[in-house]
Swiss-Prot record:
InterPro entries: Nop56/Nop58, NOP58/56_N, Nop_C, Nop_dom, Nop_dom_sf, NOSIC. The keyword Nucleus applies. One of its GO terms (molecular function) is snoRNA binding. The keyword Nucleus applies. It comes from the Eukaryota. This is Nucleolar protein 56. It is found in: Nucleus, Nucleolus. Residues 475-486 have a biased composition (Basic residues). Residues 450-486 are annotated as: Disordered.
Amino acid sequence: MSEVPHFVLYEHAAGYALMKIKEFDDAGLILQEVDAAHADGYKFSQIVELASFDPFKNTEAALENCNSISEGLAHPDLTNFLQKSLPKKKKHVVLGINDSKLAGSLTEAFPDLKLVFGGVITEILRGTRVHFERLAKNLPHHSLSKAQLSLGHSYSRSKVKFDVHRVDNMVIQSIALLDQLDKDINLFGMRIREWYSYHYPELFRLAPDQYKYSRLAVAILDRNKMAENENLENEILEILDNDSEKTAQIIEAARTSMGMDISDLDLENIKRFAARVSSLMEYRQQLHEYIKDRMDHCAPSLSALIGEQVGARLISHAGSLTNLAKYPASTVQILGAEKALFRALKTRSNTPKYGLLFHSSFIGKAGTKNKGRVSRYLANKCSIAARVDCFSETPVSTYGEFLRQQVEDRLEYFTSGTVPKKNIDVMKEAEEAAVEVKEKVIKKKKKAAKKAKRLAEESVTATAEAEVDEDAPKPKKKKKSKAGDE
């Protein structure tokens, strides 16, 4: 049974409150009393009363204290408040607190103070939270609710800003969209080929690429009217990257095609669908460039080691870059092969050697006997790269490039027996090279920030000048005299 506290610390959005507890001989009795008084504010006020309250100076101070408490640190405002509010002789004083993480910091500030948490303290704080407006009669109730709302918004905003790896959320969504686009493009590409092959079946063999096929279908459309379009040959040449031989084959095959004639309405629908498919393929390429750019900002070392797409899939499967950095190399190795792993454990057969890492070029280069070894080694380097990217203030791709060279040296060792460099020597070289790159990146960021600030100031100045010009009184036009008309 926990000890009965003399005081309980309650952290409100408006400030710190010290609640005085009615004296009880046994914690079991106070627990029964508190449980019985939860629904009745008057009964609860007979057990708990407000001894002291210290409001925060402003919203910034409230947010600062809130962040300190969430990290388990006693803010100077809190220690000053307890120093003033608690009895001078703290040797036999028992203080109840909500969070056990705060105990260590308070014990350093008040060595003689006895701290308790959990059990009856939780119930007292729950009742205090419900009936605080009744207990704090002198405080305006509307200001308490406003303080809670303001602090809630500020704390949430600071947490979102503190998440330095929030860019990985964009990577996760983008790689999921890329995978979905690949499926849709393959499905739509086959559909347009089947549809247009009724009219021009030979084009399927002459243009196997889906993107070029879709563009050719839009350009040619009705093969019987190709002679009417004088610029058609140039369009086909452009689509086929100036391959004149292939262009001549397509034009010749269109003249002697065995396809059936299709109405203009059907051809119009084929044209619209083919244009949509080709635009989807163009957007897919743009999305790939976007993922590459995001990965260079979010995880440059991981991207340099195994490529943008495989790295993005690892982050997506782990849930975030932070989660991936926390995984051991053995988990990274089989990430994406969970079904095969559990099936192997259930049937007591061999566990999988790799998951998403199979799509890396290193696994394809390795021999059959060495695929498992290379997979283990690559997973180890991926784990290191993820941790470097996650916990570096200025992530750069230097470490990933050196780690990639290590994997290539290991492949060379398996094939020719050439002994690679020691890991400690490679990491020293990487550290020296990374320092120079980081300095350049920081300089670029500072220049970009200065430029953005200057542009913002110019924009504000221009807006202010425009408003002044609008507010300035316009000169009145003189009325023409009617004397001349008379």
